């Protein structure tokens, strides 16, 4: 009996130790050898702190975590919120592609070992990931505008290629699509069950990461969609300016903005010292290190919780990362103050905002086509739009950022239409320059469509110099 009791005690103790070991591994408190699907077999130092509530002062690590946009708990969003007597008419969505592999490599360092195949059992997980892969395999004959028709429909390289969408990026947009589906289809019935291809407008730049992000969002929004009803148009310009891309004044603003960035960097002695330290570690000239845009690669290490690269002379570290990230935050602050980027944004964003307003006006008049519009784009697409709208407090577009324009009809006064603007789920309508003081002057709960129309058709040019009344004249005027 004594031996039996001792055996049971030892068995319970062994079970407790096993549980503690698994718990410690889960919380990254002891090293764990990763499988092929998890990355390198080496022990990896944990570099990513747990997200916390927003700190009282600007924290570069917290800002970087927001930028990573790691899929976690369900997101609280304000899309689709309106008084009960308003009817949703159309929705226009701009997205930045999801998490990607770096566009730049730090010379003389090992590339981060990130697996760009999609594995349903690997984190980050999504219940529809396996079904998404199966559906993409059925789309080999999809008819997209060239060159989109030659791009892969989902990422599939064991070692990611330059700029390739990762599994994290796919999951980010599956979640975006699922969120929009719950709000716009299940709640507001934006599209009928037998929706047609004419009711969608889909556009992507020619990068695989934007097409694949668009497809992931679309699958979350319309699971098992009919491939014959889906057509992505190709947009050659990251500004989505279509046939209105030639704009000399916009280019002048951009050149002066780039000059401002350069001068700010020269003034930052901490940044130059940090670049010098990093260059010494990897044994290259400081100028070469700076040209390699090391923050791009370091953000990939950070977002994927992989140790920063090392050489025989040492390792790049969190302090280097913090200095560069802090400079980025300071650059964004000064950018809004100097207004050069604002001038660039007004001209850069006008063509796509004009297209959006025209679609809204057609929908308001009863046109039933293009009720859901999706532009799959880049940070350099969303950032000018945010700036042009006057959203100066908006953070730089994170991975899988979304900007949504909603058009609503007042059922009590069917001729009246209103708009809502949402950025990453937050209602920013009354922070825009065209509606920031409307609620002070009117008891109406929504911003009139006319305000947005007037802003795009007139006020954007007034904000530039006041003398131009159309896009062509503004682009060929003087003012930068």
From Swiss-Prot:
GO terms for molecular function: phosphatase activity. The active site is at residues 97, 379. The keyword Disulfide bond does not apply. It is an enzyme of class 3 (hydrolase). It is found in: Golgi apparatus membrane. It is a single-pass type II membrane protein. The chain crosses the membrane at residues 7-27. InterPro entries: His_Pase_clade-2 (IPR000560), His_PPase_superfam (IPR029033), Histidine_acid_phosphatase (IPR050645). Its main location: Golgi. Residues 28-480 are lumenal. It catalyses: 3-O-[beta-D-GlcA-(1->3)-beta-D-Gal-(1->3)-beta-D-Gal-(1->4)-beta-D-2-O-P-Xyl]-L-seryl-[protein] + H2O = 3-O-(beta-D-GlcA-(1->3)-beta-D-Gal-(1->3)-beta-D-Gal-(1->4)-beta-D-Xyl)-L-seryl-[protein] + phosphate. Residues 1-6 are cytoplasmic. GO terms for biological process: chondroitin sulfate proteoglycan biosynthetic process; glycosaminoglycan biosynthetic process; positive regulation of heparan sulfate proteoglycan biosynthetic process. Interacts with B3GAT3; the interaction increases the 2-phosphoxylose phosphatase activity of PXYLP1 during completion of linkage region formation in a B3GAT3-mediated manner. Belongs to the histidine acid phosphatase family. This is 2-phosphoxylose phosphatase 1. It comes from Mus musculus (Mouse). The gene is Pxylp1.
């Amino acid at each position: 009996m004594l031996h039996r009791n001792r055996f049971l005690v030892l068995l319970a103790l062994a079970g407790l130790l096993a549980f503690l070991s698994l718990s410690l591994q889960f919380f990254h408190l002891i090293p764990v050898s990763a499988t092929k699907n998890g990355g390198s077999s080496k022990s990896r130092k944990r570099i990513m702190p747990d997200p916390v509530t927003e700190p009282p002062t600007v924290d570069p690590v917290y800002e970087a975590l927001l930028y990573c946009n790691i899929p976690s708990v369900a997101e609280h969003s304000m899309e689709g919120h309106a008084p009960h007597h308003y009817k949703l008419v159309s929705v226009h969505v701009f997205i930045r592609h999801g998490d990607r592999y770096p566009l730049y490599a730090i010379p003389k360092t090992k590339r981060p070992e990130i697996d760009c195949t999609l594995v349903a059992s690997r984190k980050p997980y999504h219940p529809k990931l396996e079904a998404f892969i199966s559906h993409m395999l059925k789309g080999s004959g999809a008819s997209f505008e060239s060159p989109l028709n030659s791009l892969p429909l989902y990422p599939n390289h064991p070692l990611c290629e330059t700029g390739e969408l990762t599994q994290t990026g796919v999951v980010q947009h599956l979640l975006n699509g699922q969120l929009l589906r719950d709000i716009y289809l299940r709640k507001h019935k934006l599209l009928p069950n037998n929706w047609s291809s004419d009711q969608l407008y889909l556009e992507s730049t020619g990068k695989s990461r934007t097409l694949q992000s668009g497809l992931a969002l679309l699958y979350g929004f319309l699971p098992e969609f009919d491939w014959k009803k889906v057509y992505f148009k190709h947009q050659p310009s990251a500004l989505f300016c279509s046939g209105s891309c030639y704009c000399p004044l916009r280019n002048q603003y951009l050149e002066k903005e780039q000059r401002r960035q350069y001068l700010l960097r020269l003034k930052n002695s901490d940044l130059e010292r940090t670049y010098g330290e990093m260059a010494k570690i990897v044994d290259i000239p400081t100028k070469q290190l700076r040209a390699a845009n090391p923050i791009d690669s370091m953000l990939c290490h950070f977002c994927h919780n992989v140790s920063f690269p090392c050489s025989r002379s040492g390792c790049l570290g969190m302090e280097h990362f913090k200095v560069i990230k802090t400079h980025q935050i300071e650059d964004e602050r000064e950018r809004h103050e100097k207004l050069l980027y604002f001038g660039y944004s007004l001209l850069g964003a006008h063509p796509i905002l004009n297209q959006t307003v025209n679609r809204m006006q057609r929908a308001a008049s009863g046109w039933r086509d293009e009720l859901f519009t999706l532009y799959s784009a880049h940070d350099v697409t969303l950032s000018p739009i945010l700036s042009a709208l006057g959203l100066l407090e908006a953070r730089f577009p994170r991975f899988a950022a979304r900007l949504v324009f909603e058009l609503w009809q007042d059922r009590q006064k069917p001729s009246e239409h209103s708009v809502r603007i949402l950025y990453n789920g937050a209602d920013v309508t009354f922070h825009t320059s065209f509606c920031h003081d409307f609620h002070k002057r009117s008891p109406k709960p929504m911003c009139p469509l006319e305000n947005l129309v007037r802003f795009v058709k007139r006020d954007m040019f007034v904000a530039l110099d006041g003398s131009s009344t159309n896009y062509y004249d503004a682009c060929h005027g003087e003012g930068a």
